[in-house]
Amino acid sequence: MVVINGVKYACDSCIKSHKAAQCEHNDRPLKILKPRGRPPTTCDHCKDMRKTKNVNPSGSCNCSKLEKIRQEKGITIEEDMLMSGNMDMCLCVRGEPCRCHARRKRTQKSNKKDNLSINSPTNNSPSPALSVNIGGMVVANDDILKSLGPIQNVDLTAPLDFPPNGIDNKPMESFYTQTSKSDAVDSLEFDHLMNMQMRNDNSLSFPMSANQNEVGYQFNNEGNNSMNSTMKNTITQMDQGNSHSMTLHDIDEILNNGIELGNVN
Protein backbone atom coordinates (compact mmCIF):
# COMPACT_ATOMS: atom_id res chain seq x y z
CA MET A 1 0.00 0.00 0.00
CA VAL A 2 1.43 3.36 -1.10
CA VAL A 3 0.46 6.42 0.99
CA ILE A 4 0.85 9.85 -0.60
CA ASN A 5 -0.27 12.93 1.37
CA GLY A 6 -2.43 10.78 3.61
CA VAL A 7 -4.19 9.13 0.67
CA LYS A 8 -3.81 5.37 0.15
CA TYR A 9 -2.98 4.00 -3.29
CA ALA A 10 -2.56 0.52 -4.78
CA CYS A 11 -2.09 -1.03 -8.20
CA ASP A 12 -4.95 -2.55 -10.16
CA SER A 13 -3.71 -6.16 -9.91
CA CYS A 14 -3.38 -6.00 -6.11
CA ILE A 15 -6.84 -4.49 -5.76
CA LYS A 16 -8.41 -7.29 -7.83
CA SER A 17 -6.53 -9.97 -5.88
CA HIS A 18 -7.54 -8.39 -2.55
CA LYS A 19 -3.91 -7.65 -1.65
CA ALA A 20 -4.08 -3.87 -1.60
CA ALA A 21 -2.64 -3.71 1.93
CA GLN A 22 0.52 -5.49 0.72
CA CYS A 23 0.95 -3.52 -2.49
CA GLU A 24 4.37 -1.83 -2.92
CA HIS A 25 4.42 -1.48 -6.71
CA ASN A 26 5.61 2.06 -7.27
CA ASP A 27 6.42 1.35 -10.93
CA ARG A 28 2.76 0.61 -11.84
CA PRO A 29 -0.19 2.94 -12.24
CA LEU A 30 -1.87 3.39 -8.87
CA LYS A 31 -5.51 3.91 -7.88
CA ILE A 32 -6.98 5.53 -4.80
CA LEU A 33 -8.27 2.98 -2.31
CA LYS A 34 -11.84 3.63 -1.35
CA PRO A 35 -12.63 3.29 2.33
CA ARG A 36 -14.62 0.30 3.43
CA GLY A 37 -18.32 0.57 3.86
CA ARG A 38 -20.79 2.94 2.39
CA PRO A 39 -19.22 6.22 1.34
CA PRO A 40 -20.61 9.16 3.33
CA THR A 41 -22.12 12.01 1.37
CA THR A 42 -22.96 14.48 4.10
CA CYS A 43 -20.40 16.47 6.00
CA ASP A 44 -19.63 16.07 9.67
CA HIS A 45 -21.53 19.22 10.49
CA CYS A 46 -24.72 17.90 8.89
CA LYS A 47 -24.31 14.58 10.68
CA ASP A 48 -24.22 16.36 14.00
CA MET A 49 -27.15 18.56 13.07
CA ARG A 50 -29.19 15.54 12.00
CA LYS A 51 -29.13 14.26 15.57
CA THR A 52 -31.26 17.19 16.67
CA LYS A 53 -35.01 17.10 16.09
CA ASN A 54 -35.47 20.46 14.44
CA VAL A 55 -32.94 20.01 11.61
CA ASN A 56 -33.45 17.96 8.47
CA PRO A 57 -30.65 17.91 5.85
CA SER A 58 -33.06 15.91 3.65
CA GLY A 59 -30.18 14.33 1.74
CA SER A 60 -29.19 17.54 -0.03
CA CYS A 61 -25.78 17.94 1.63
CA ASN A 62 -23.01 16.93 -0.77
CA CYS A 63 -20.20 18.81 0.91
CA SER A 64 -18.22 15.70 1.75
CA LYS A 65 -18.61 14.31 -1.75
CA LEU A 66 -17.56 17.58 -3.36
CA GLU A 67 -14.54 17.80 -1.10
CA LYS A 68 -13.35 14.36 -2.21
CA ILE A 69 -13.69 15.39 -5.83
CA ARG A 70 -11.56 18.44 -5.14
CA GLN A 71 -8.94 16.30 -3.47
CA GLU A 72 -8.81 14.02 -6.50
CA LYS A 73 -8.39 17.02 -8.78
CA GLY A 74 -5.89 18.62 -6.40
CA ILE A 75 -7.71 21.93 -6.15
CA THR A 76 -9.00 23.94 -3.24
CA ILE A 77 -12.52 25.16 -2.64
CA GLU A 78 -11.55 28.71 -3.59
CA GLU A 79 -10.21 27.50 -6.94
CA ASP A 80 -13.38 25.46 -7.43
CA MET A 81 -15.49 28.56 -6.81
CA LEU A 82 -13.52 30.50 -9.41
CA MET A 83 -13.65 27.69 -11.95
CA SER A 84 -17.38 27.01 -11.54
CA GLY A 85 -18.37 30.63 -11.09
CA ASN A 86 -20.40 29.76 -8.02
CA MET A 87 -19.24 32.08 -5.27
CA ASP A 88 -21.97 30.92 -2.86
CA MET A 89 -20.59 27.48 -2.03
CA CYS A 90 -20.83 26.05 1.44
CA LEU A 91 -17.66 26.54 3.44
CA CYS A 92 -18.35 23.97 6.14
CA VAL A 93 -15.08 22.23 5.28
CA ARG A 94 -13.36 25.38 6.50
CA GLY A 95 -15.17 25.24 9.82
CA GLU A 96 -18.08 27.48 8.95
CA PRO A 97 -21.70 26.35 9.58
CA CYS A 98 -23.11 24.25 6.79
CA ARG A 99 -25.81 25.92 4.75
CA CYS A 100 -27.11 22.73 3.15
CA HIS A 101 -29.36 21.70 6.00
CA ALA A 102 -32.76 23.27 6.50
CA ARG A 103 -34.95 23.53 9.52
CA ARG A 104 -38.07 21.47 9.60
CA LYS A 105 -41.31 23.25 8.97
CA ARG A 106 -43.65 22.47 11.79
CA THR A 107 -47.17 22.24 10.48
CA GLN A 108 -50.09 22.81 12.81
CA LYS A 109 -51.89 19.51 13.23
CA SER A 110 -55.62 19.92 13.02
CA ASN A 111 -57.25 18.32 16.00
CA LYS A 112 -60.02 16.36 14.30
CA LYS A 113 -61.47 15.12 17.56
CA ASP A 114 -62.00 18.65 18.83
CA ASN A 115 -63.58 19.75 15.55
CA LEU A 116 -65.95 16.81 15.55
CA SER A 117 -66.96 17.40 19.16
CA ILE A 118 -67.60 21.11 18.49
CA ASN A 119 -69.35 20.77 15.12
CA SER A 120 -71.31 17.63 16.01
CA PRO A 121 -75.07 18.24 15.47
CA THR A 122 -76.06 15.65 18.07
CA ASN A 123 -74.07 17.28 20.84
CA ASN A 124 -77.06 18.77 22.65
CA SER A 125 -79.64 16.19 21.54
CA PRO A 126 -80.48 13.02 23.47
CA SER A 127 -78.78 9.78 22.63
CA PRO A 128 -80.37 7.84 19.70
CA ALA A 129 -80.70 4.78 21.92
CA LEU A 130 -82.61 6.83 24.53
CA SER A 131 -84.85 8.84 22.20
CA VAL A 132 -87.64 8.23 19.70
CA ASN A 133 -88.57 10.33 16.67
CA ILE A 134 -92.36 10.81 16.69
CA GLY A 135 -93.77 13.04 13.97
CA GLY A 136 -90.49 14.88 13.53
CA MET A 137 -90.17 15.53 17.27
CA VAL A 138 -87.51 13.85 19.38
CA VAL A 139 -89.08 12.40 22.51
CA ALA A 140 -87.00 10.81 25.24
CA ASN A 141 -87.72 7.18 26.02
CA ASP A 142 -87.92 8.02 29.72
CA ASP A 143 -91.10 10.02 29.12
CA ILE A 144 -92.66 7.12 27.23
CA LEU A 145 -91.77 4.62 29.93
CA LYS A 146 -93.22 6.86 32.65
CA SER A 147 -96.52 7.07 30.77
CA LEU A 148 -96.86 3.28 30.76
CA GLY A 149 -97.16 3.14 34.54
CA PRO A 150 -95.61 0.62 36.94
CA ILE A 151 -95.09 -2.94 35.80
CA GLN A 152 -97.36 -5.43 37.54
CA ASN A 153 -95.65 -8.18 39.48
CA VAL A 154 -96.15 -11.60 37.92
CA ASP A 155 -95.87 -14.77 39.99
CA LEU A 156 -93.73 -17.05 37.84
CA THR A 157 -94.08 -19.98 40.27
CA ALA A 158 -97.87 -20.29 39.82
CA PRO A 159 -99.03 -23.09 37.45
CA LEU A 160 -100.58 -22.14 34.14
CA ASP A 161 -104.35 -22.67 33.90
CA PHE A 162 -105.88 -23.87 30.64
CA PRO A 163 -109.01 -22.11 29.36
CA PRO A 164 -112.27 -23.72 30.59
CA ASN A 165 -113.49 -24.36 27.05
CA GLY A 166 -110.15 -25.75 25.92
CA ILE A 167 -108.75 -25.12 22.47
CA ASP A 168 -111.28 -24.46 19.69
CA ASN A 169 -114.13 -25.06 22.19
CA LYS A 170 -112.95 -28.64 22.74
CA PRO A 171 -112.32 -30.02 26.22
CA MET A 172 -108.67 -30.46 27.08
CA GLU A 173 -109.22 -34.06 28.17
CA SER A 174 -109.97 -35.02 24.58
CA PHE A 175 -106.41 -34.13 23.55
CA TYR A 176 -104.98 -36.59 26.07
CA THR A 177 -107.51 -39.47 25.89
CA GLN A 178 -108.43 -39.40 22.20
CA THR A 179 -106.69 -42.26 20.38
CA SER A 180 -107.43 -44.06 17.15
CA LYS A 181 -109.05 -47.46 17.24
CA SER A 182 -106.33 -48.97 15.10
CA ASP A 183 -103.64 -47.99 17.64
CA ALA A 184 -105.58 -48.76 20.81
CA VAL A 185 -104.22 -51.87 22.54
CA ASP A 186 -107.39 -52.34 24.58
CA SER A 187 -109.40 -53.07 21.43
CA LEU A 188 -107.32 -56.18 20.68
CA GLU A 189 -108.44 -59.58 21.93
CA PHE A 190 -105.69 -61.51 23.68
CA ASP A 191 -107.81 -64.41 24.93
CA HIS A 192 -105.23 -66.94 23.78
CA LEU A 193 -102.44 -65.23 25.74
CA MET A 194 -104.33 -64.73 28.99
CA ASN A 195 -103.33 -68.20 30.24
CA MET A 196 -99.58 -67.54 29.71
CA GLN A 197 -97.43 -66.86 32.75
CA MET A 198 -94.52 -64.47 32.27
CA ARG A 199 -91.57 -66.29 33.76
CA ASN A 200 -87.85 -66.30 33.18
CA ASP A 201 -87.99 -69.78 31.60
CA ASN A 202 -91.01 -68.98 29.39
CA SER A 203 -90.29 -66.05 27.08
CA LEU A 204 -91.38 -64.98 23.66
CA SER A 205 -89.06 -63.00 21.39
CA PHE A 206 -89.65 -61.34 18.03
CA PRO A 207 -86.79 -61.47 15.48
CA MET A 208 -86.18 -58.19 13.61
CA SER A 209 -84.67 -59.46 10.31
CA ALA A 210 -86.28 -57.71 7.35
CA ASN A 211 -88.37 -59.34 4.60
CA GLN A 212 -91.54 -57.64 3.41
CA ASN A 213 -93.44 -60.75 2.30
CA GLU A 214 -92.73 -63.26 5.06
CA VAL A 215 -92.97 -63.05 8.85
CA GLY A 216 -91.55 -65.27 11.58
CA TYR A 217 -91.41 -65.76 15.31
CA GLN A 218 -88.98 -67.53 17.60
CA PHE A 219 -90.55 -69.25 20.55
CA ASN A 220 -88.00 -70.06 23.21
CA ASN A 221 -90.10 -72.62 25.06
CA GLU A 222 -91.82 -74.96 22.69
CA GLY A 223 -93.07 -77.13 25.57
CA ASN A 224 -95.46 -74.56 26.96
CA ASN A 225 -98.73 -76.50 27.18
CA SER A 226 -100.73 -73.47 28.31
CA MET A 227 -100.71 -71.93 24.79
CA ASN A 228 -103.29 -72.66 22.19
CA SER A 229 -102.24 -75.42 19.81
CA THR A 230 -103.01 -73.28 16.78
CA MET A 231 -100.71 -70.51 17.99
CA LYS A 232 -97.95 -72.98 18.79
CA ASN A 233 -98.07 -74.62 15.38
CA THR A 234 -98.16 -71.25 13.64
CA ILE A 235 -95.08 -69.97 15.45
CA THR A 236 -93.01 -73.11 14.90
CA GLN A 237 -93.82 -73.13 11.15
CA MET A 238 -92.47 -69.60 10.61
CA ASP A 239 -89.05 -69.16 9.10
CA GLN A 240 -86.63 -67.71 11.64
CA GLY A 241 -84.19 -66.36 9.06
CA ASN A 242 -86.64 -64.31 6.97
CA SER A 243 -88.82 -62.31 9.32
CA HIS A 244 -89.69 -58.77 10.24
CA SER A 245 -91.39 -57.13 13.20
CA MET A 246 -95.14 -57.72 13.26
CA THR A 247 -97.83 -55.27 14.21
CA LEU A 248 -100.41 -55.85 16.91
CA HIS A 249 -103.04 -56.26 14.20
CA ASP A 250 -101.12 -59.23 12.70
CA ILE A 251 -100.82 -60.89 16.11
CA ASP A 252 -104.51 -60.44 16.78
CA GLU A 253 -105.37 -61.96 13.40
CA ILE A 254 -103.15 -64.98 14.06
CA LEU A 255 -104.60 -65.53 17.52
CA ASN A 256 -108.23 -65.20 16.43
CA ASN A 257 -108.14 -67.02 13.07
CA GLY A 258 -105.34 -69.50 13.65
CA ILE A 259 -103.50 -68.70 10.40
CA GLU A 260 -100.83 -71.29 9.57
CA LEU A 261 -97.84 -70.19 7.52
CA GLY A 262 -95.62 -72.65 5.75
CA ASN A 263 -91.84 -72.69 5.80
CA VAL A 264 -90.23 -70.15 3.52
CA ASN A 265 -87.38 -71.33 1.29
Swiss-Prot record:
PANTHER family: TRANSCRIPTIONAL ACTIVATOR HAA1-RELATED
Location(s), subcellular: Nucleus
Protein name per UniProt: Metal-activated transcriptional activator protein AMT1
GO MF annotations, alphabetized: copper ion binding; DNA binding; DNA-binding transcription factor activity, RNA polymerase II-specific; RNA polymerase II cis-regulatory region sequence-specific DNA binding; transcription cis-regulatory region binding; zinc ion binding
Biased composition annotated in UniProt, kind: Low complexity: 119-128
Gene3D superfamilies named among the record's database cross-references: Copper fist DNA-binding domain
Chief location of this protein within or outside the cell: nucleus
Gene Ontology process terms (BP): intracellular copper ion homeostasis; intracellular iron ion homeostasis; positive regulation of transcription by RNA polymerase II; transcription initiation at RNA polymerase II promoter
Residues annotated for Zn(2+) binding in this entry: C11, C14, C23, H25
CC annotations in GO: nucleus
Domain of life of the native organism: Eukaryota
Residue ranges flagged as DNA-binding region: 1-40
Region (Disordered): 103-129
Protein keywords: Activator, Copper, DNA-binding, Metal-binding, Nucleus, Transcription, Transcription regulation, Zinc
Task of the protein: Trans-acting regulatory protein that activates transcription of the MT genes (metallothionein) in response to copper or silver ions.
